[in-house]
């Protein structure tokens, strides 16, 4: 079975992956407002795909990212942008991103196999919503900014998980059993953060319009100490001598 993500190998002369070999497509894209999902949005827009974006308010402490998602959706003129509320996910707790009693780890990048910022079954839920929306819109492509290099401990960012969900889409939907082939695209799955930064630049993405911090201040200013901030800064520092892009000023 072909993999659910369709990565085109990049070279210095061709930094932007070519579109998979089919005609113009309709896709549902998971848009958080962070660097990875924004880069995916810029990429599929470059490909000429018709984009329906989904964002989620699940009680995350970094809810300010949703404002960035709205701005990105407007800038890239997506066909539609839906904000889905999943209050129960936040109510369940169990993650530093949704449970105020669990502190977001600082300066702890790579110290645990599965960090406490993992939100139980989050991508499973997000992809299920995306699949439902895709079926109503006649879309066959679902795009997610999952990355298995920077967050190798997240079980719902692994290739095996995405392959399995593609099978779920085929077996568990009317469109699937009638022969529609849904495909999960994770174009950044095996790309380093520096590689993502380079791709974002090649696509002309305004990276300062994205928010990556897990524990931001009320105005979106980053803590610069959580895993996500450290990965972002590392990516910019490694990308052709690039420097950190705001909003990454330290909170006061």
Predicted regions and their residues:
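ATP-dependent adenylation/nucleotidyltransferase module used to activate substrates
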Residues: 3-204
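Iron-sulfur (Fe-S) cluster-binding segments and ferredoxin-like electron-carrier domains
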Residues: 219-222, 227-249
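Immediate flanking context of iron-sulfur cluster ligation sites
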Residues: 203-224
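AMP-forming adenylation/ATP pyrophosphatase catalytic core
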Residues: 24, 140, 231, 248-252
């Amino acid at each position: 079975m072909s993999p659910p993500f369709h990565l085109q190998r990049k070279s210095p002369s061709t930094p932007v992956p070519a579109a998979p070999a089919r005609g113009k497509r309709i896709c549902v894209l998971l848009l958080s407002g962070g660097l990875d999902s924004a880069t995916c949005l810029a990429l599929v827009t470059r490909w000429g795909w018709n984009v329906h974006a989904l964002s989620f308010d699940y009680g995350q402490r970094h809810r300010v990212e949703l404002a960035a998602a709205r701005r990105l959706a407007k800038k890239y003129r997506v066909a539609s942008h839906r904000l889905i509320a999943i209050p129960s996910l936040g109510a369940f707790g169990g993650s530093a991103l949704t449970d105020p009693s669990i502190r977001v780890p600082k300066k702890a990048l790579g110290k645990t196999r599965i960090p406490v910022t993992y939100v139980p079954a989050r991508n499973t839920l997000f992809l299920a919503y995306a699949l439902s929306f895709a079926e109503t819109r006649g879309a066959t492509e679902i795009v997610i900014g999952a990355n298995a290099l920077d967050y190798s401990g997240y079980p719902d960012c692994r290739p095996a998980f995405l392959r399995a969900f593609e099978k779920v889409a085929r077996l568990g939907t009317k469109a699937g059993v009638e022969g529609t082939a849904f495909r999960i695209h994770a174009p950044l799955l095996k790309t380093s953060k520096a590689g993502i930064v380079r791709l974002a630049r090649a696509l002309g993405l305004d990276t300062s319009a994205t928010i990556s911090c897990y524990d931001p201040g009320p105005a979106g200013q980053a803590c610069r100490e959580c895993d996500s901030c450290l990965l972002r800064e590392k990516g910019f520092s490694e990308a052709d001598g690039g420097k950190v892009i705001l909003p990454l000023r330290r909170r006061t």
